[in-house]
C-alpha cells in the first residue's frame, strides 16, 4: 500500500537532495580529448594534474589517464555528472620522493609506453603496440602492449622524452615549472593516486620503493577522493579552463623528442582507435 504520509514527511528532504544533485556546479570551457595524452602534453592531463596540485601544496604531480580514448565535453557540469568527468574512486596520496626516484619512476612509465626506435624512422612504431587476434571479430587488430593506466606523466617539472634512447636515458628533466633547479638528491612532495600508492603498475618499485612499508614511510598526506577535489575546485574556480589548468609556471611542460616522435605516436594511436 502506498504510504502518502511517508512521502509527505520526506518530500522536502527529497526535493533538496534532487535540487543539489541536478544543480550546476561548474563548467568545462573547452572539450577535453584524452587520446592526445599518448603523444603530447594535453589539456586533459593538465586538468588531472591541476586537480592534484590544487588540493595540497605539492611540488610534482604524477598521473595516468582515466580515459583510454574518450572525451569530456564542453558545457555545464551538474553534481551528478562529476562521476562522468572523474570516473574512478581514486583518492589523493602525497609522498616524499627524491629527484633521482622521480626520474626512475618516469623512466619506468615511459618504458611501458614507447619503444626505442632507430633509423630509418619512417615506418617505426614508437608507441608500444602489437597485433593480436580480436576475438569479437576473428581478425587481427592493433592493441597496446601495456595498460595505459600505468602511463604516468608528470606536472610541476619541465622535461623531454627521447624515443631514440634506451630505457634509463630517455627522460631529461631540465628544471622545475617555476624555473628553479631540479636536483636529484633533493626530496620533493609528489601527488599520486591511491591506485598507484598500493604498488599498481610497479612504478614506485621501479623508483626504488621496494615494498609497502617503504611507501608508507614516505606518505605525508592522505587526501579525499578526487571527485570531492573536483567538486571543491569547481566551487572555488567555477570552471575547468585549459588556459588556467595549462599554466606552464604550475604544470610545467614535457614533450617527446626528436621532432618526428609525436606524429609517429599519433599514427600508432590511429591504428588503435581510428582517426
Sequence positions of predicted segments:
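Catalytic centers of hydrolytic enzymes
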Residues: 1-275
Amino acid at each position: 500500500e502506498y504510504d502518502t504520509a511517508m512521502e509527505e514527511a520526506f518530500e522536502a528532504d527529497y526535493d533538496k537532495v534532487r535540487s543539489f544533485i541536478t544543480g550546476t556546479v561548474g563548467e568545462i570551457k573547452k572539450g577535453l580529448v584524452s587520446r592526445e595524452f599518448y603523444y603530447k602534453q594535453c589539456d586533459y592531463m593538465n586538468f588531472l594534474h591541476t586537480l592534484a596540485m590544487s588540493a595540497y601544496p605539492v611540488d610534482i604531480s604524477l598521473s595516468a589517464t582515466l580515459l583510454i580514448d574518450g572525451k569530456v565535453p564542453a558545457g555545464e557540469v551538474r553534481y551528478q555528472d562529476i562521476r562522468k568527468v572523474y570516473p574512478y574512486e581514486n583518492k589523493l596520496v602525497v609522498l616524499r620522493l627524491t629527484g633521482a626516484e622521480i626520474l626512475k619512476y618516469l623512466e619506468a612509465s615511459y618504458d611501458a609506453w614507447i619503444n626505442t626506435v632507430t633509423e630509418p624512422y619512417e615506418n617505426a612504431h614508437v608507441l608500444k603496440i602489437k597485433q593480436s587476434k580480436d576475438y569479437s571479430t576473428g581478425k587481427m587488430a592493433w592493441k597496446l602492449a601495456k595498460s595505459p593506466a600505468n602511463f604516468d606523466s608528470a606536472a610541476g617539472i619541465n622535461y623531454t622524452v627521447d624515443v631514440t634512447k634506451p630505457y634509463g636515458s630517455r627522460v631529461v628533466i631540465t628544471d622545475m615549472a617555476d624555473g628553479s633547479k631540479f636536483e636529484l638528491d633533493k626530496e620533493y612532495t609528489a601527488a599520486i593516486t591511491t591506485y598507484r600508492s598500493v604498488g599498481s603498475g610497479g612504478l614506485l618499485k621501479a623508483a626504488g620503493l621496494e615494498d609497502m612499508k617503504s611507501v608508507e614511510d614516505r606518505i605525508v598526506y592522505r587526501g579525499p577522493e578526487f571527485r570531492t577535489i573536483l567538486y571543491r575546485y569547481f566551487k572555488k574556480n567555477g570552471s575547468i579552463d585549459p588556459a588556467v589548468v595549462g599554466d606552464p609556471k604550475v604544470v610545467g611542460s614535457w614533450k617527446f623528442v626528436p621532432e618526428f616522435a609525436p606524429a609517429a605516436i599519433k599514427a600508432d594511436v590511429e591504428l588503435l582507435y581510428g582517426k
